[in-house]
Structures are given as C-alpha cells and as structure tokens.
C-alpha cells in the first residue's frame, strides 16, 4: 500500500466503509440504546430461575431497571422502581400493579423475553424470523434448567463480542477448537442470515476424543445428534450456543462504548439424573465455565481488538 499523508488519511473513503467510532463514540452509544436496545426483544433470563410463585429476577435493559416475576397467571415483567435484590421471593406483590408492565413472553426452551417497546410490531417468534428453527425441537421437547451462571465485565464494545460469536477467523486462537474441530467439515459450516439481523451457524460434529480422550456422544439434547454444534446469533448481541450435551446463552448489556457486561448461563434438562447433570456441568465448564479455556480465549480476543 502506498504511503499517505495526513490529509489523505482524513479524507472520506470512496468505497463503502464502517467508521471506527461505532466502537468508541458516546453519542453513538446513546443512540444505540434508544434506537436498538429499547426496541428489540431480549432473552433476559430463564423460567427455571423463578420456579416458584412470586419468585423474581431483576435485570436492566438500556439503563432501565426491570423485574421479572412468576405470578399465578404466568411470568410478567415490569419496570422496577424498588431496590430489590438480584433475585428472591416477594412477600407482597400488590405494588407491582403501580408499575409499568412490559411486554413479556416465555419462548424457545423457557427463555423469558422482554422488550421496552410499549408498542412492539412483532412478537418473539416474528422477531426471531426462523433463526431458531434449527434447534427449536431440541429446546422445546423437554423442559430446561439453568445449572450455571456467571458474568463478566469486559473492556470492549458489545459489537466485537457479537462478531466473535459469528465469524471463524478468531478460532485460530483456540487450543480446544484446533484439536477438536479444525477439519473440512468445520470450515464448510454455513452462516445463514435471517430478517432482523439474525444469523445461525450450521452444525458439524465435534471430535471431543481429540481433546480429552472421552466420547461425549452418549449425552445430548432431544432430537440433536451426538456432539453436534449449532449457534444462533441474535441481533443486536445475544448468542444461543448448543454444543453436544450443554446449552449456553450469552446476554450482553452495554455499559459504555468500551465496556460490556456479558451474562453466561449453562443449561441441562430438568429431568436429568444427578449423574447426567454432573456430566453436563463437567462438559460445559471444561469449555465455557469460569475456569475453562475456550471462553477466556474469546474474551482476550475482543479485549485486544
């Protein structure tokens, strides 16, 4: 590439381009909160986190505190004006009726979806636009249950995390991926785009024997062939990752242009025996847990971009 002087670097490109300020500009950050995060459906938690009547779970979307409550008539979501703890059980729910109720649905394996939009033009299924078709039977055949939760606050823009869940070039950083999956089938996977900005990544069979010498195929999800791997990447930054015996979800909450909170959950089947659950937890945590390997390599990758 020929050398450029200062004015040439500042000159607007003559081809399509993405301005790097999308990763650092506060005005763009606030605009994204208003025009994106306050408008979309977000799978904010799971019904198994609020299993009993009056159980609640708090969260935030676009700096708006919200609370999801398991009421007798079903799961409901409200703007949360109180200083509730992260989760618990409400002795009194009458104050909720003075709060603004938010649109809420339980869909796709028991995920609790919430939108701040008071007049959404689409329900969750319309919003997903077919992106879940590849794994819906695996999620809906049996009730699911959260067995793992941790979160990270990362010095990076949320869009970089979303990118790392949908492209393949960063996988060369991964030791586990190189030994279990770098084959022709891995790179033959197809990224399929859907309306509303969603993508899913086609499946292939992971060779876990190359990693830990163990055949993990005996334990899977309903209708899912052994050791298969599917990913659903939802706009603007949510990830549903079904890999063999465990399901992982990533829910992003942008905190600043250069800071994002990511909540990671691991799921098994509610009907799991103690032995099956222990095996799923082991499989999940080896790759994706807080002391695993793969997840940290992803996070290091986006923090360095």
Language-model features and meaning:
Residues 1-79, 104-105:
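N-terminal pre-ligand scaffold of iron-sulfur
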Residues 38-51, 83-88, 230-236:
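Short Pro/Gly-enriched beta-strand edge/turn motifs at strand-loop
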Residues 51, 67-73, 102-305:
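C-terminal catalytic domain of Rieske-type non-heme iron oxygenases
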Residues 72-105:
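Long, hydrophobic, well-ordered secondary-structure blocks that form the structural core
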């Amino acid at each position: 590439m020929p050398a450029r002087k200062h004015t040439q670097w500042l000159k607007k490109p003559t081809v399509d381009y993405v301005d790097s300020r999308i990763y650092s500009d506060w005005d763009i950050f606030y605009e994204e909160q208003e025009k994106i995060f306050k408008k979309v459906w977000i799978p904010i938690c799971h019904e198994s986190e609020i299993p009993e009547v009056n159980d609640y779970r708090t969260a935030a979307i676009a700096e708006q505190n919200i609370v999801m409550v398991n009421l007798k008539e079903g799961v409901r979501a409200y703007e949360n004006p109180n200083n509730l703890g992260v989760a618990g059980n409400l002795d009194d729910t009458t104050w909720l009726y003075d709060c603004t109720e938010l649109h809420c649905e339980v869909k796709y394996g028991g995920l609790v979806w919430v939108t701040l939009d008071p007049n959404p033009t689409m329900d969750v299924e319309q919003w997903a636009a077919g992106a879940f078709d590849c794994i819906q039977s695996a999620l809906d055949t049996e009730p699911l249950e959260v067995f793992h939760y941790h979160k990270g606050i990362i010095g990076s823009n949320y869009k970089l995390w979303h990118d790392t869940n949908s492209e393949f070039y960063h996988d060369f950083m991964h030791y586990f991926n190189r030994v279990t999956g770098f084959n022709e089938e891995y790179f033959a996977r197809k990224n399929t785009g859907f309306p509303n900005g969603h993508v899913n990544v086609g499946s292939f069979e992971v060779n876990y024997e190359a990693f830990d010498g163990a055949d993990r195929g005996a334990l899977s999800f309903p209708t899912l062939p052994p050791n298969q791997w599917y990913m659903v990447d939802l706009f603007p930054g949510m990830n549903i990752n079904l890999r063999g015996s465990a399901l992982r979800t990533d829910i992003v909450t942008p905190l600043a242009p250069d800071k994002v909170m990511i909540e990671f959950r691991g799921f098994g089947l509610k009907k799991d025996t103690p032995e099956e659950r222990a095996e799923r937890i082991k499989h999940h945590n080896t790759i994706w847990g807080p002391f695993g390997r793969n997840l940290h390599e992803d996070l290091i990758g986006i923090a360095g971009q």
